[in-house]
């Protein structure tokens, strides 16, 4: 399995999940597709990118992170629970 860092720099595009793939569309045209399980990180550079909840859940479920940027500088990170705490703590 290969891991990729995906940069989304196209302003006004939308990210959706279809059959395990992250799909990027703009103006009704598909710009690209990649298997969510192959991602280690998604870097959102464009400020007007629409992301579906299924994409958030899919990326985080596969232990990847999402980095949010403004003016091409990181301003926040979405991280899966497995990277923020030990699950054994909440099981007991």
At which residue positions do the language-model features occur?
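N-terminal intrinsically disordered, cationic/polar leader segments
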Residues: 1-92
